[in-house]
């Protein structure tokens, strides 16, 4: 049940959660086979998260190896994965699971030296859980690029046989069946929507990954100038004009920043990066 409620006098009635499964399944008597292609990079952060204070308001005793916290977090990770797969199996038969995680060869750091450097140092427990995914859950390490690029590579081969599982908005630049396990939400992203999502991100960037390459250009501007029915050339022109506006008519800077944003945002098939 969703925590959102509606009230009638003193009675509060829970509003059922809609996971949107009806938008992608018409016959629930038939279970399609799906290959689950999972962006697992967020799981170590989610499963090791602790609030500053416990339920009684006391300072939290954070997980450490010494106090057995790493084992607790590993148990949470195992339960999280099992819970996600159980939810998927309510509607699909899981043929294969690919848990994808990042490696150490990311060309985006060569294209932009400050890429993701503004993030705080990764906690030891997150690194521990990352290794657990590899050692105990047979996670696939991206040999080049990021976990998202591994997913792109797999989906290029699998097509609609894949169920893309993750919470990163970058994944919504891929067409296909999607499951956001955090929101418990299914959707199908068609080619037009995926392309619109991609060019929107190129235009406004991603502050969680890299510096703002198009100053003062935000979501509202993107919604105003981009349209889902645009051709590729129309997208390029509209996005270029946005960068030109951001860099006050400086053609060279606008072109340079747009090309860089394109490279950073794009999910690459491994063959394109070799």
Task: Specify the residue positions occupied by each region the protein language model found.
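Extended two-metal-dependent nuclease catalytic cores across DNA- and RNA-processing enzymes
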Residues: 2-24, 94, 117-274
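Domain-level signal for Mg2+-assisted phosphodiester chemistry and nucleotide/NA-binding surfaces
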Residues: 2-131
């Amino acid at each position: 049940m969703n925590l959102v409620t509606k009230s009638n006098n003193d009675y509060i009635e829970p509003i059922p959660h809609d996971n949107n499964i009806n938008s992608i399944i018409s016959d629930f008597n038939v279970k399609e086979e799906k290959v689950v292609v999972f962006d697992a990079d967020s799981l170590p952060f989610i499963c090791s998260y602790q609030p500053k204070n416990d339920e009684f308001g006391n300072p939290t005793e954070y997980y450490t190896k010494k106090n057995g916290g790493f084992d607790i977090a590993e148990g949470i990770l195992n339960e999280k994965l099992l819970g996600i797969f159980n939810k998927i199996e309510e509607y699909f038969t899981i043929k294969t699971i690919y848990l994808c995680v990042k490696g150490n060869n990311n060309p985006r750091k060569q294209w932009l030296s400050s890429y993701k450097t503004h993030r705080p140092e990764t906690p030891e427990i997150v690194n521990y859980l990352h290794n657990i995914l590899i050692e105990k859950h047979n996670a696939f390490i991206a040999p080049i690029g990021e976990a998202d690029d591994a997913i792109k590579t797999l989906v290029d081969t699998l097509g609609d046989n894949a169920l893309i599982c993750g919470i990163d908005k970058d994944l919504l630049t891929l067409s296909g069946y999607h499951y956001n396990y955090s929101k418990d939400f299914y959707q199908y992203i068609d080619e037009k929507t995926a392309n619109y999502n991609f060019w929107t991100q190129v235009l406004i960037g991603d502050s969680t990954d890299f510096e703002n390459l198009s100053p003062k250009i935000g979501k509202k501007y993107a919604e105003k100038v981009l349209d889902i029915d645009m051709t590729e050339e129309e997208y390029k022109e509209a996005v270029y004009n946005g960068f030109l506006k951001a860099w006050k008519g400086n053609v060279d800077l606008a072109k340079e920043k747009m090309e860089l944003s394109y490279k950073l945002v794009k999910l690459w098939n491994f063959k394109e990066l070799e």
